[in-house]
């Protein structure tokens, strides 16, 4: 049922309730029955109102139905209504109401499922990897989730900025530099004098080789960095290695089809004095104290749910990792992004309350800023066994490995199809299979099958566009029409909950409904009018499948 139709039906039900219970304030909710035989849409409004009104719920439901069906507008939407169980009202739509989605999709095309611009802006930060190695499968899940959430925000009318925060300051960067230095001097990772916390992947050898060759590298948002070849200068090695890996990560993201609007460097917060300013402000406002030679933030007093106070400056000097995060999010707020979303691994759960506490102490920024989507681990399986190691990365499967093995469409869909807060097993064999069990193949095949069907039909686009949808009355056609009408509400729900898996589920279900219809009803029948009507339903399905796939960053192929 189209959203506009739902709004109209809710208004009509409220008017019917007012006739039965003039004093009642009806909060009408509609839902799709779990069993198709029970109708197209249902409400429990009679059950909600019966007890306070001291009425029998079934009798009240019947009164609401009688008052509703006396309205001419209701009869245009509702074919019949029945009372079920303790007082549910189940509605069946008129054929015209069911078929209205075809014209809605035809008139809106790519915009079907999208909302008008709302004048709001949001910053979504994701991937945000340390520039110390190739992007891994966890980063791939962030990339898939983050880009899909950005696309959902855009479809919901928001002005979206994609941002990548580089953790380019701290011990991990020093460990990168000494690792490259060691490999440049011919020290192998298994040698006793190799740095204890050094990185061991083959990519370290590649960096050392290019540093010795005095090559130049350039990240997408930076200036070229030319290697000096001086293995005694850790500063030179550090600058080249960071630029090298940032470029490598850029290439991984390009292979994934992902472009960021902005890159923000952690080091810039130190260089600009924003980290020190953050600490000084929290001290001046009385939100800190000294103990054991360390500086502590009174997070337990700042109302964000932290269970103990947190160290900001360690006793041996240097700030803990959440301090620059507080400074960074203060900068986000000052840039005018009062809506911000961070997509991070679930191992960052402990930082949420700390960052929000720091922001409360700094400027009284709302306690729910920023919003977080925390995702769990990805396990990669192949041939029934877990894949743990990539030769190039040394200790983990990379994002590029996944893309090379199964293609970016499968990577994106598979990493989105489950709730972010659940662990996910990425089955390489399943992602490569050409079967109904592979959801991305199943969905893309539905789109390609429609393209082939229309191409072989001999009908022109104009003939299909003018077909009479009143002929679409088969049960499988009604089921498919109902699914297509749900799409805008699914998009809105996915955006509201920051949960793109809702779209992935819908796409799978829509493909299933299409294949069921295709197998139940011949499309290219001898009767010209019916043939064109069914081709029009197929074309409508193709459009909405393409719209849904686009929200996930997945292609809609014409041929497979």
Swiss-Prot record:
Motif ('HIGH' region): 164-174
Family membership: Belongs to the class-I aminoacyl-tRNA synthetase family.
Superkingdom of the organism of origin: Bacteria
UniProt keyword annotations, A-Z: Aminoacyl-tRNA synthetase, ATP-binding, Cytoplasm, Ligase, Nucleotide-binding, Protein biosynthesis
Catalytic activity as recorded in UniProt: tRNA(Arg) + L-arginine + ATP = L-arginyl-tRNA(Arg) + AMP + diphosphate
Protein name according to UniProt: Arginine--tRNA ligase
Signal peptide range in chain numbering: none
Biological classification of the source: Bacteria, Pseudomonadati, Pseudomonadota, Betaproteobacteria, Burkholderiales
């Amino acid at each position: 049922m189209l959203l506009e139709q739902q709004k109209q039906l809710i208004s009509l039900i409220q008017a019917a309730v007012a006739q039965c219970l003039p004093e009642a304030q009806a909060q009408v909710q509609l839902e799709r029955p779990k069993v198709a035989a029970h109708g197209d849409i249902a409400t429990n409004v009679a059950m909600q109102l019966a007890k306070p009104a001291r009425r029998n719920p079934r009798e009240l439901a019947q009164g609401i139905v009688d008052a509703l069906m006396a309205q001419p507008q209701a009869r245009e939407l509702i074919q019949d209504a029945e009372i079920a169980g303790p007082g549910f009202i189940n509605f069946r739509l008129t054929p015209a109401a069911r078929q209205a989605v075809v014209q809605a999709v035809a008139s809106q095309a790519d915009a079907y499922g999208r909302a008008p611009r709302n004048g709001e802006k949001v910053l979504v930060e994701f991937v945000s990897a340390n520039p110390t190695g190739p992007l891994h499968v966890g980063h791939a899940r962030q990339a898939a989730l983050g880009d899909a959430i950005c696309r959902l925000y855009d479809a919901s009318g928001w002005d979206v900025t994609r941002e990548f925060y580089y953790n380019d300051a701290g011990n991990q960067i020093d460990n990168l530099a000494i690792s490259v230095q060691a490999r440049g001097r011919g020290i192998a990772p298994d040698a006793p004098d190799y740095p204890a916390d050094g990185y061991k992947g083959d990519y370290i050898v590649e960096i050392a080789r290019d540093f010795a060759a005095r090559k130049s590298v350039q990240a997408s948002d930076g200036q070229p960095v030319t290697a000096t070849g001086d293995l005694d200068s850790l500063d030179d090695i550090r600058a080249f290695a960071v630029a090298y890996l940032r470029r490598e990560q850029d290439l991984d993201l390009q292979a994934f089809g992902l472009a960021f609007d902005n890159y923000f460097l952690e080091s810039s917060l130190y260089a600009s004095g924003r980290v020190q300013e953050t600490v000084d402000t929290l001290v001046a406002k009385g939100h800190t104290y000294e103990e054991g030679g360390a500086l502590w933030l009174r997070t337990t007093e700042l109302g964000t749910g932290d269970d103990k106070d947190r160290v900001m400056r360690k006793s041996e000097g240097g700030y803990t990792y959440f301090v620059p995060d507080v400074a960074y999010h203060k900068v986000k707020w000052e840039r005018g992004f009062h809506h911000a979303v961070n997509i991070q691994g679930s191992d960052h759960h402990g930082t949420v309350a700390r960052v929000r506490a720091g922001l409360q102490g700094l400027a009284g920024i709302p306690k729910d800023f920023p919003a977080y989507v925390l995702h769990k681990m990805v396990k990669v399986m192949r041939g029934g066994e877990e894949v743990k190691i990539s030769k190039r990365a040394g200790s983990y499967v990379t994002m590029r490995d996944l893309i090379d093995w199964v293609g970016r469409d499968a990577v994106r869909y598979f990493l989105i199809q489950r709730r972010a807060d659940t662990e996910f097993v990425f089955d390489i064999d399943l992602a490569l299979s050409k079967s109904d069990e592979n959801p991305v193949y199943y969905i893309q095949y539905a789109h390609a099958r429609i393209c082939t069907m229309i191409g072989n039909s001999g009908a022109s686009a104009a003939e299909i566009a003018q077909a009479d949808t009143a002929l679409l009355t088969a049960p499988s056609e009604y089921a498919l029409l109902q699914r297509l009408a749900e799409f805008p509400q699914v998009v809105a729900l996915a955006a509201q909950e920051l949960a793109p898996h809702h779209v992935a589920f819908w796409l799978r279900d829509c493909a299933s409904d299409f294949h069921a219809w295709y197998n139940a009803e011949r499309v290219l029948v001898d009767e010209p009018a019916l043939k064109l009507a069914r081709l029009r339903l197929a074309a409508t399905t193709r459009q909405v499948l393409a719209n849904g796939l686009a929200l996930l960053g997945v292609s809609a192929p014409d041929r497979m």
